[in-house]
Amino acid sequence: MDLIFDVSGLKSEDDEFGSSKKDVLKYLKIIGVDTRFISYTPEKIYINNLRFSKFSRTREATFKKQYPEIEVVRSKLFQKICSKSSKHLALEIEPNSAILMPKDNYIVDLLMEPYTRKYGVKLVYEGDYDLIVNPLILDDQVNNIFEGIFKGEGLNYTKNDKEIYPLANVSLDWINSFLEMDGQELIKNENENELAKSFSEFLDEVAPQYRDNVVSASEFLKNKLETE
């Protein structure tokens, strides 16, 4: 059950809420939203996890009174993407680390932004860093594996310990469906190997969930070979 927040008494002459990121996040916290589970942009607030964020319709109405110009995005698809991504990031991110971000990658920006509050990380686009974001998506990961097999190179499944992979188990279809719905530029596959793509398209028809299974099998075989 939501509490109805009267925030008028919380503001003084020296405590007006402006349009800065700091003020918006402070206001959200005051009305009971857990900002570790939302992604902030100046124009939109994206809910990553509705339950954990506690960003109810009542709290949204309170928020919109203060910030009518900021849209609250409740996309269930985006929440599913965040859930998939968090399974990787929870294991890969080191608290308080500096993370080098890719340029012009809107979906990665959205996924990584909450970790500045969850783990105290600093997102950088140049200069010194501890970890680097690899924007590898699930489709390219699978196509890389198939390409290596077809070329006789083996699994071609490698990951760098200094890299993190927020999109490694998120499909191109999910990503572009969300980006299109949100009015953003779509992304493309990096791996354009024709044989790998054709085989992936064939498997799409007969076993739509194959991608996760291919990656899981490759991880198992890689670990097995490393221990022998």
Model-derived features with residue positions:
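C-terminal catalytic and target-recognition region of SAM-dependent MTase-like enzymes
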Residues: 220-228
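Short secondary-structure transition/capping segments
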Residues: 82, 124-129, 204-216, 226
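ATP-dependent adenylation/nucleotidyltransferase module used to activate substrates
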Residues: 1-2, 16-183
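Mid-to-C-terminal catalytic subdomains of enzymes
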Residues: 2-10, 35, 171-216
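Surface-exposed, low-hydrophobicity interaction/linker segments
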Residues: 8, 12-18
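A short, terminal or domain-edge coil/loop segment
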Residues: 142-147, 212-213, 217-220
